[in-house]
Regions:
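Anion-binding and metal-coordination hotspots
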Residues: 1-226
């Protein structure tokens, strides 16, 4: 259980989570399943750089319904440019501080384009498509998640992590912060996890004792006994 402040994005906590896993277990996992909230290029790059295969939930990206989405444009890795549905090139112009490359079309070409109204907003003069510098890592993670092995690994996430987290929130009060400070919240989270583990231990003991009880009374009596 990794506790952070409410003003810290979950994606920013990935390096600390990996360090904590490695310090506790002595090694890092080969695969890591994450929900759609972690579906971005920096997270995929961080995991792959540590030899961890990301298994990410799909995020349906939003865009204006009256304009063409980014996925309608074809990327050419050799020329480092995009091609629009009409065949025009969008060349790389700049890279912002967040690591996104901006590919822009020629305003003079877009002015007379027949698909201009469906391509971008009326107030704009050209189409701009962004691509992260680590987009290749995200595309590799998406491709693996769609494979049978990736689907199988991701299905285990909802049976284990999501189920445990839902029980902690619904049944054990982890939905609300009952203490102040990160140290106190870690204490609440660890106590909640301890309670869940004790419930699992009690359930397993009851199942094993029930099996022994049934097998004992279902065994036929020895005929040599009086």
């Amino acid at each position: 259980t990794h506790i952070t402040g409410a003003n810290v994005n979950d994606c920013d906590a990935i390096p600390d989570v990996l360090k904590e896993i490695e310090s506790r277990l002595g090694s890092l996992p080969l695969f890591m399943g994450l929900d759609a909230g972690y579906h971005n290029a920096p997270v995929a790059h961080q995991l792959r750089s540590r030899n961890i295969q990301p298994v990410l939930g799909h995020r349906r990206h939003t865009h204006a319904h009256d304009t063409l989405s980014k996925h309608r444009f074809r990327y050419n890795p050799e020329l480092n440019c995009y091609t629009c549905p009409e065949g025009c090139l969008l060349e790389h112009k700049t890279t912002d501080r967040d690591g996104y490359r901006h590919y822009c079309s020629d305003a003079r070409t877009c002015k007379d384009c027949p698909g201009r109204e469906k391509c971008f907003a009326e107030k704009s003069v050209r189409k701009v498509v962004t691509r992260h510098v680590w987009q290749d890592d995200l595309e590799q993670a998406d491709a693996f998640t769609k494979t049978p092995a990736g689907k199988n690994l991701y299905s285990w996430r909802k049976q284990t992590i999501e189920r445990s987290f839902a029980d902690a929130k619904q049944l054990h009060g982890l939905r609300y912060a009952r203490m102040l400070g990160l140290a106190n919240m870690r204490e609440q989270a660890f106590l909640t996890a301890a309670v869940q583990n004790m419930k699992k231990i009690a359930s397993l003991l009851w199942q094993s004792l029930s099996c022994l009880w049934i097998s004992f009374f279902s065994t036929p009596a020895c005929p040599c006994l009086p």
